[in-house]
């Protein structure tokens, strides 16, 4: 890099660090870490040598396809063939359709509900593993939580298809006490079950690791001051683990938002989620550009939500 450009970057970083500082006069910890580590090491040839494979991989298999997908959203399909162009017709058509926005709202609602429910279901178990079990037992529990990933997600989804069917295990159990049968497949409930099945092991692992790293002296001090169990959870544990809990919920939302299998096989695709809408659009006259519009909408939505969640989590953590 040109020496003048390097000098400008360092000067801007110093000015920004002086502007964003704590009340005591020290630099903001995030910016201080950025200045001391990133700016000092990244520009050296030694550091670039190790980071080059990651940069090349991301450029070839993420940034490149992403840019092509964005460009493809402006292409046109004529006689079932995609032609290069720069037209806003696909965007105007898709953004003006009510079914697109209905699918968008439904996908947001289902992914958000799945993230919230998964976090609530996982938290008591994670709390028990972090504070009530030994370290050896916790390791075995985490290993057992990894085992579901050894099997195909599609196979696990079909197993829930059998469980939730009208003649399945759940309705058979309810029938023994005079209840049912209930329709659970091809409903939003089936979609939620699939989302929770997909995200629960990962969220539980992340929450357990986060809670296990909380300083036990803080919890003990709160108990010595007379705080009850619920007071300890809300006043000490949740604020201390806020960043990890937000990241776990964020992963659940991202996985559910982009999932195709659960809403298609368990939810019946009525109404369709955005991934199902993408598949249906490509099957309808080879409209890949219109499907690219929906994909870009999903990418922008996930970027905004992920960026907002990360900023809020780390900003609050740094401000304590």
Language-model regions, residue ranges each:
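Membrane-water interface segments at the C-terminal ends of transmembrane alpha-helices
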Residues: 46-79, 94, 98-212, 236, ...
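A short amphipathic helical element positioned immediately N-terminal to and/or at the very start
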Residues: 87-95
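Short glycine/proline-centered loop/turn elements that form peptide/ligand docking sites
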Residues: 214-218, 318
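The alpha-helix within a helix-turn-helix
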Residues: 222
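Glycine/proline-centered hinge or cleavage motifs at structural transition points of membrane proteins
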Residues: 225-227, 239
């Amino acid at each position: 890099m040109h020496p003048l450009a390097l000098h400008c970057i360092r000067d801007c970083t110093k000015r920004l660090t002086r502007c964003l500082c704590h009340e005591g006069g020290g630099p903001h910890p995030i910016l201080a870490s950025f200045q001391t580590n990133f700016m000092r090491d990244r520009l050296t040839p030694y550091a670039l040598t190790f980071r080059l494979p990651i940069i090349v991989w991301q450029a070839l298999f993420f940034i490149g396809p992403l840019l092509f997908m964005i460009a493809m959203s402006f292409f046109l399909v004529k006689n079932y063939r995609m032609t290069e162009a720069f037209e806003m017709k696909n965007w105007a058509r898709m953004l003006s359709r009510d079914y697109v926005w209905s699918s968008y709202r439904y996908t947001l609602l289902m992914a958000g509900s799945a993230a919230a429910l998964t976090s609530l279901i996982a938290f008591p178990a994670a709390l028990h593993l972090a504070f009530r079990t030994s370290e050896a037992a916790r390791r075995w529990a985490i290993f057992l939580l990894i085992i579901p990933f050894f099997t195909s997600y599609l196979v696990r989804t079909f197993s829930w298809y059998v469980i939730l069917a009208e003649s399945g295990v759940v309705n058979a159990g309810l029938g023994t006490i005079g209840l049912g049968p209930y329709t659970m497949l091809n409903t939003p409930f089936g979609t939620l079950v699939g989302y929770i099945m997909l995200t629960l092991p990962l969220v539980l692992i992340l929450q357990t690791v986060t809670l296990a790293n909380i300083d036990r002296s803080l919890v003990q001090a709160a108990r010595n001051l007379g705080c009850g169990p619920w007071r300890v959870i809300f006043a000490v544990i949740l604020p201390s683990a806020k960043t990890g809990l937000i990241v776990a919920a964020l992963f659940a939302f991202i996985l559910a938002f982009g999932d195709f299998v659960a809403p298609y096989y368990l939810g019946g695709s009525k109404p369709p989620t955005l991934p199902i809408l993408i598949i249906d659009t490509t099957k309808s006259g080879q409209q890949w550009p219109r499907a690219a519009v929906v994909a870009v909408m999903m990418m922008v939505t996930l970027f905004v939500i992920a960026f907002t969640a990360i900023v809020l989590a780390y900003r609050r953590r740094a401000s304590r």
